[in-house]
Curated annotation (Swiss-Prot):
PANTHER family: INTESTINAL TREFOIL FACTOR-RELATED, TREFOIL FACTOR 3 ISOFORM X2
Biased composition (Basic and acidic residues): 147-170
Keyword entries, A-Z: Disulfide bond, Glycoprotein, Repeat, Secreted
Organism per entry: Xenopus laevis (African clawed frog)
Gene Ontology cellular component list: extracellular space
Chain intervals for the UniProt region annotation (Disordered): 27-109, 122-170, 231-297, 404-516
SUPFAM superfamilies the UniProt entry points to: Trefoil
Taxonomic lineage: Eukaryota, Metazoa, Chordata, Craniata, Vertebrata
Purpose of the protein: Could be involved in defense against microbial infections. Protects the epithelia from external environment.
Positions of region (8 X approximate tandem repeats, Thr-rich): 218-301
Protein name as catalogued: Integumentary mucin C.1
Region (8 X 8 AA approximate tandem repeats, Ala/Thr-rich): 81-144
Disulfides per UniProt: 162-188, 172-187, 182-199, 307-333, 317-332, 327-344, 354-380, 364-379, 374-391, 526-552, 536-551, 546-563, 573-599, 583-598, 593-610, 621-647, 631-646, 641-658
Entry keyword annotation includes Disulfide bond: yes
Sequence repeat start-end pairs: 81-88, 89-96, 97-104, 105-112, 113-120, 121-128, 129-136, 137-144, 218-224, 225-239, 240-249, 250-259, 260-275, 276-287, 288-294, 295-301, 402-411, 412-419, 420-431, 432-443, 444-453, 454-460, 461-472, 473-479, 480-491, 492-498, 499-515, 516-522
């Protein structure tokens, strides 16, 4: 112990530290631990604290039986010295000192550990702290610098790619798209500018590719800086540098998204469209026109030529925000490769099927129906001709309706025989006795016996009333004849078997009932409490008149409204009082208003009671953009325009946005 204290004092160390080291050494010796005495000699030589720490670490490794090379590498890197000193000193001393001390006596063990504990305790802590701080600071600073540089590069490149003039922007997405939705499409978003395109495509893809290449070359530099250190902190830094590569990979799906849009353009051409033309006749021949399920499930592949047409000649088949799958289930074409055009449109055969003369159109909807509502019914829509039906059935649909009419229930064959001839034909009549035959004949001579008729000139005017399914028909015949011989008239019931050879012109009249196609409502649309029914008709309205208006009819519950609006129609009449457009005149009654197919609500005073529904209001604003009549002034807002009772639509450029209703 005195020797250890003297050595500590000689090296210029603190006396307190030496005392603490001695006490710790004595405890170590008492516990029977093994220490490496040469450490005191190394510390006494006045070497740098870092070298002492490296030597202590090497001795500890040697005592544990590890290879000295592992400790040499980090010590050399942190201290900046040659590995020869640490390697030579640490293993040799530890190998010689450790066994001798373990097998020696107690005094030798107590004398040696004191400087070892004092020398190794303080420098090791300092060296470890210095090494840890230096090792962690370098790679972390380099990684953060690389990240900030990458962020500035990506933000500047994004600004460069999104710097497009408003006049040259190509729309990316639908009207009203949010910034988040726009960014998901990898497009640019700029809400500045009145009436411009807010979500638009980037500049040509060549610039985008150069940007990705620059980012890829910068990422490996950051990883090389982190690899230089081998401490645990360095491992953490390497993990943080990895997301830089992930960012580069994340930019790659931009190209994939663009390719997907190109693929979609070709695929829809060969999918569904002849469904409407081919399937409809098959369905209607077998079943009634109510069976529309087969039409929806059957899918017929169309040729690519069905969808090849000029973008300006496309006829809209969908509605705002329709998806590709929804469009194809309707049997229409889908092509989203050309911006600012109709993406879901009819095929050539469907366009031809909707070419119906205005006078021959069969109504498919109701007054004021919108284009979207009409197309959801799979009907044709054409608002270019005023005063005609805008929503109507196609040619194939009308033909299918006529084919489905069964002649057994609607056709009543009635035969009226008018004889204008002089016949000299022997007639053999067999009369079967029946109890239901009633004959009333006004003639000069009435007989019911078989006779041979002589030449007679007879003019017969007969009125025959024949029920549809009655076998025996009572006949009332009034015969006015000028003859020289008595006239014999024989009345034969329908069940009589008659074999006669006569030359008599016969006129057959066939009555065919053609059922007019009416708008059908599903049972779910008419299910509501009787007290909540909104009157759709007027006193004395019939069921056919009610259904022709597209309303529900139920006469099973007395003292309730029998003709009432369906649930969608009730919702369609939910118009805010400030947005109502007058459909009538001052003092109009509810019946007069409903005869105009308008909504009536007298519950709120000081507002319009008879007004157009939401769909009717939209239909009045859905005319061709080129025929709009300006209702506002430059810079008018949408709220001011609507308060004027006018239409507002800013989706089409170079036309009035605030315009009068049609």
């Amino acid at each position: 112990a005195p020797t250890t204290a003297a050595a500590v004092a000689a090296t210029g160390k603190d006396t307190t530290a030496a005392a603490e080291g001695s006490a710790a050494a004595e405890k170590t010796a008492a516990a029977g631990e093994v220490s490496a005495p040469p450490t005191a000699a190394v510390a006494a030589t006045g070497e740098d604290a870092t070298t002492a720490a490296a030597t202590a670490a090497a001795e500890t490794t040697a005592a544990a039986g590890e290879a000295p090379t592992t400790t040499t590498a980090p010590a050399t890197t942190a201290a900046g010295k040659a590995p020869t000193t640490a390697a030579a000193t640490a293993p040799t001393t530890a190998a010689a000192g450790a066994p001798t001390t373990a097998t020696g006596k107690a005094p030798a063990t107590a004398a040696a550990p004191v400087p070892t504990t004092a020398a190794s305790k303080a420098p090791t802590t300092a060296a470890a702290a210095t090494h840890s701080t230096a090792a962690a600071a370098a790679p972390t600073t380099a990684a953060s610098a690389a990240k900030s540089k990458e962020r500035s590069t990506s933000s500047s490149s994004e600004e460069e790619h999104c710097h497009v003039k408003p006049s040259k922007r190509e729309m990316c997405g639908s009207k009203g798209i949010t910034k988040k939705q726009c960014k998901k499409k990898n497009c640019c978003f700029d809400p500045k500018g009145h009436g411009g395109i807010h979500c638009f495509h980037r500049k040509p893809k060549g610039h985008s590719h150069e940007e990705h290449t620059t980012t890829t070359t910068k990422a490996p530099t950051t990883i090389q800086i982190a690899t230089t250190t081998t401490t645990p902190t360095t491992t953490t830094t390497t993990t943080k540098a990895t997301p830089t590569t992930t960012t580069t990979t994340k930019a790659t799906p931009t190209t994939t998204t663009t390719t997907k849009a190109t693929t979609t353009t070709t695929t829809p051409t060969t999918t569904t469209t002849t469904t409407k033309a081919t399937t409809t006749p098959t369905t209607t021949t077998t079943t009634t026109p109510t069976t529309t399920t087969t039409k929806a499930t059957t899918t017929t592949t169309t040729t690519s030529g069905e969808c090849k047409m000029e973008p300006s000649k496309r006829e809209d088949c969908g509605y705002s925000g329709i998806t590709e799958s929804q469009c194809r289930t309707k049997g229409c074409c889908f092509d989203s490769s050309i911006p600012q055009t109709k993406w879901c449109f009819y095929t050539l055969s469907q366009v031809a099927d909707c070419k119906v003369e205005p006078s021959q159109r069969v109504d498919c909807g109701f007054r004021g129906i919108t284009a979207d509502q009409c197309r959801q019914k799979n009907c044709c829509f054409d608002s270019s001709i005023s005063g005609t039906k805008w929503c109507f059935y196609s040619t194939s649909q009308v033909a299918a309706t006529k084919t489905t009419t069964t002649p057994t229930t609607t056709t009543t064959p009635t035969t009226t025989t008018t004889t204008k001839a002089t016949t000299t034909t022997p007639t053999t009549t067999t009369t079967t006795p029946t109890t239901t035959t009633t004959t009333t004949t006004t003639t000069k001579a009435t007989t019911t016996t078989p006779t041979t008729t002589t030449p007679t000139t007879t003019t017969t005017k007969a009125t025959t009333t024949t029920p549809t399914t009655t076998t025996t028909t009572p006949t009332t015949t009034t015969t006015k004849a000028t003859t020289t011989t008595p006239t014999t008239t024989t009345t034969t019931p329908t069940t009589t078997t008659t074999k006669a050879t006569t030359t008599t012109p016969t006129t057959t009249t066939t009555t065919t009932t053609t059922t007019k196609a009416t708008t059908t409502t599903t049972s779910g649309e008419c299910k509501m409490e009787p007290s909540k029914r909104a009157d759709c008709g007027y006193p004395g309205i019939t069921e056919s008149q009610c259904r022709s208006k597209g309303c529900c009819f139920d006469s099973s519950i007395p003292q309730t409204k029998w003709c009432f609006y369906s649930l969608p129609q009730v919702a369609d009449c939910k118009v805010a009082p400030s947005s109502r457009v007058d459909c009538g005149f001052g003092g109009i009654t509810a019946d007069q208003c409903r005869q105009r197919n308008c909504c009536f609500d007298s519950s709120i005073s000081g507002t319009k009671w008879c007004f157009y529904s939401t769909s009717q209001g939209n239909a009045m604003c859905s005319g061709p953009p080129t025929k709009r009549r300006d209702c506002g002034y430059p810079g008018i807002s949408s709220s001011v325009c609507i308060n004027r009772g006018c239409c507002w639509d800013n989706s089409v450029m170079n036309v009035p946005w605030c315009f009068y209703r049609t």
